[in-house]
């Protein structure tokens, strides 16, 4: 499984060569084995919690074929709100800053059938070309744990490269998706600001020009395109979205 792209994994699920539960167990097994040395994922949920989400997803009336990420486990950069999980920004005083609702991108991922398992590590406030902070510590490179995974989406990059998750969101102002992707032998994409909507009322980016934008990291360009098709598009909370 660990060598497969997101699109290949989705194909295996559709062909029933692997079940959603088996996929989840596979990734949690790798997380248990490799995340202690990588420190790529933080604020992790338990597998039992995520399995309950999967059962609820299977019980809903919407057909699987309409859910483009059905049963895919994902983690979200620790600058982005996931209801019930802390958004720490890598800052110790925010370790108990539990989000009361999802960000727009998280709602779109969940609506597509994704299972949110936790957060990906980031430098404090997402500022830096290397991923380390006082809240959780440094993220290591899966190819050599004595080396950096880059930043600021270093937790996302290390998680994909180590096959802890198949794809991830990121954010990018001056290379924060592209830098860690290069460090971890992946593809990172910084889209035009507004392609992936954000709640601008929560950010300082209320006026043009907007420098920082949400983006994505993946094993293949095809995976990037697939992910962007899901999370992009206009939203009433973002006047610059399209």
Where do the language-model regions lie?
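Alpha-helix C-terminal capping segments
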Residues: 157-167
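Gly/Ser-rich catalytic serine loop of serine hydrolases
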Residues: 98, 145-157, 171-176, 180-181, ...
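An N-terminal boundary/leader segment
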Residues: 1-52
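Short pre-catalytic strand/loop immediately N-terminal to key active-site residues, enriched for Gly-Thr
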Residues: 92-100, 137-152, 212
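Paired acidic/hydrophobic, glycine-rich loop segments that form the ligand-binding mouth/hinge
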Residues: 117, 166-170
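Enzymes and membrane/adaptor proteins characterized by extended Gly/Ser/Thr/Asp/Glu-rich
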Residues: 34, 68-105
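Nucleotide-cofactor and metal-assisted catalytic machinery
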Residues: 109
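A short helix-breaking turn/cap at a secondary-structure junction
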Residues: 190-242
């Amino acid at each position: 499984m660990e060598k497969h792209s997101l699109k290949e994994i989705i194909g295996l699920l559709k062909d029933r060569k692997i079940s959603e539960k088996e996929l989840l167990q596979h990734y949690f097994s790798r997380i248990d084995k490799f995340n202690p040395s990588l420190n790529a994922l933080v604020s992790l949920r338990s597998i039992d919690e995520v399995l309950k989400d999967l059962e609820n997803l299977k019980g809903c009336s919407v057909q699987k074929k309409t859910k483009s990420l059905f049963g895919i486990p994902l983690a979200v950069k620790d600058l982005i709100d996931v209801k019930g999980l802390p958004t720490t920004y890598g800052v110790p005083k925010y370790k108990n800053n539990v989000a009361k609702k999802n960000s727009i991108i998280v709602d779109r991922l969940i609506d597509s059938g994704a299972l949110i398992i936790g957060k990906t590590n980031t430098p404090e406030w997402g500022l830096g070309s290397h991923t380390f902070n006082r809240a959780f510590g440094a993220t290591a490179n899966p190819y050599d744990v004595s080396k950096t995974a880059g930043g600021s989406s270093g937790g996302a990059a290390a998680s994909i490269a180590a096959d802890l998750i198949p794809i991830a969101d990121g954010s990018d102002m001056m290379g924060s998706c592209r830098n860690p992707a290069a460090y971890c032998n992946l593809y990172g994409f910084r889209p035009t600001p507004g392609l992936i909507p954000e709640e601008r009322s929560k950010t300082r980016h209320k006026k043009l020009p907007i420098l920082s934008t949400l983006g994505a990291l993946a094993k293949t360009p095809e995976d990037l395109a697939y992910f962007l098709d899901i999370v992009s598009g206009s939203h009433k909370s973002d006047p610059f979205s399209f």
